[in-house]
Regions:
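Short, surface-exposed coil-to-beta transition loops
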Residues: 54-58, 151-155, 167, 179-180, ...
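Gly/Pro-enriched, hydrophobic low-complexity segments
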Residues: 136-205
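Short, solvent-exposed recognition patches
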Residues: 208-296, 310
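Short, hydrophobic/aromatic-rich segments at coil-to-beta transitions
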Residues: 39-43, 65-71, 137-144, 165-168, ...
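Hydrophobic/aromatic beta-strand elements that line small-molecule binding cavities or substrate pockets
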Residues: 57-63, 131, 155-159, 184-185, ...
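An acidic-aromatic
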Residues: 56, 60-112, 171-183, 189-191
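Intrinsically disordered, low-complexity linker/loop segments enriched in Gly/Pro
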Residues: 106-155
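N-terminal leader/targeting segments and the immediate start of mature chains
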Residues: 2-68, 76-77, 104, 120-122, ...
Length: 325
């Protein structure tokens, strides 16, 4: 019995040493990625794909004394563009002649960003170095992020060895299969970026403009709201809450985001006017994105996120309405 116990303790000690070694190896790369995401000038083309759909996007990223700016141009013929200036994001949709303006969240960008500190992330993910590879002809360090439960996806990252810029990511499902991919096919690092390269080619004057509310709700405000979520997956906390006006929608939509520091889920609550045939009931998915919808007290609740179906269902079925005094 003592021998067995000694073997278990010895094995646990080795596992702990390996875990500590992995953490020590990954942390510098996360810090390097964080710096690269906000300190480099570059221009390139990346592909973003899920299922059989593949989109090609041109990106121009600039950092100067005026701040951080970015321009994304869709190469699929729609002419859609996304302009980022600090935390202000302008999305241009030529096909619907509309423009959406809102404030961005830290992770809502390309290339995808990841937390710089492992911290609480370790409670829900295992992080380790996973060898070397090349992307767009550039040497990279691979990092594997594995979930500790079935309520979130894993990630495989390819980080540029010289600059720390994230050049490729795979989002991995419960069977460790890629369900979404982001990858640079061409990248050029620049000394500076001309101002006109960050301006859209589209004349937006005759477009309809929609602007998100500029007064996000705090967690305390949510506690006073008529809506609350009784059960969240472990580690998930409110990241954002605000009212949106969505194109082709008359009534404003309440939008909340919950995150574990890596995965995020959006909850949309809107008045159900019984006129929309687009409302989702039950579960649905498109590639890595899962969704769950239901009606409640004359409202329609939709939960969407790049997480397993079980996660959006858990959150969707936990949304409740309460009468306030």
């Amino acid at each position: 019995m003592r021998n067995k116990l000694a073997m278990v303790v010895f094995g646990a000690g080795l596992s702990l040493q390996a875990w500590a070694s992995d953490i020590a190896g990954v942390q510098p790369w996360l810090e390097k990625m964080h710096q690269a995401a906000h300190m480099l000038n570059y221009e390139g083309t990346f592909v973003y794909g899920q299922q059989d759909q593949l989109s090609s996007i041109r990106i121009i990223h600039s950092v100067s004394e005026a701040g951080e700016r970015e321009r994304l141009i869709s190469m699929d013929g729609t002419g859609r563009e996304v302009l980022r200036d600090g935390d202000r994001v302008t999305c241009i949709y030529p096909d619907s002649q509309s423009v959406m303006v809102e404030k961005s969240r830290p992770r809502a960008k390309y290339p995808p960003t990841f937390p710089v500190e492992i911290g609480e992330l370790n409670n829900h993910y295992r992080l380790s170095l996973a060898g070397k590879d090349k992307v767009a002809g550039e040497p990279t360090q691979k990092i594997l992020i594995e979930p500790r439960d079935n309520l979130r996806y894993g990630h495989l990252l390819w980080v540029h060895e010289k600059t720390g810029l994230l050049l490729k990511t795979n989002l991995l499902n419960e069977r460790n299969k890629p369900v979404e991919q982001f990858m640079f096919t061409q990248i050029i690092f620049l000394d500076d970026v001309p101002e006109d390269a960050l301006e859209p080619d589209i004349n937006k004057e005759d477009f309809t403009w929609y602007e998100a509310s500029d007064n996000p709700q705090s967690a305390e405000a949510e506690q006073r709201s008529e809506w609350y979520i009784a059960t969240l997956p472990p580690g998930f906390k409110q990241d954002m809450s605000r009212m949106h006006r969505i194109p082709n929608s008359v009534m404003p939509v309440e939008h909340r985001v919950y995150s574990d520091g890596l995965a995020s889920v959006s909850v949309f609550i809107e008045k159900d006017d019984n006129k929309s045939s687009d409302n989702l009931f039950g579960g649905s998915h498109m590639g890595a994105v899962n969704a769950h919808g239901r009606n409640l007290n004359g409202y329609h609740v939709t939960v969407v996120g790049e997480v397993p179906q079980a996660t959006v269902k858990m959150i969707g079925e936990s949304v409740h309405y309460r009468e306030l005094p």
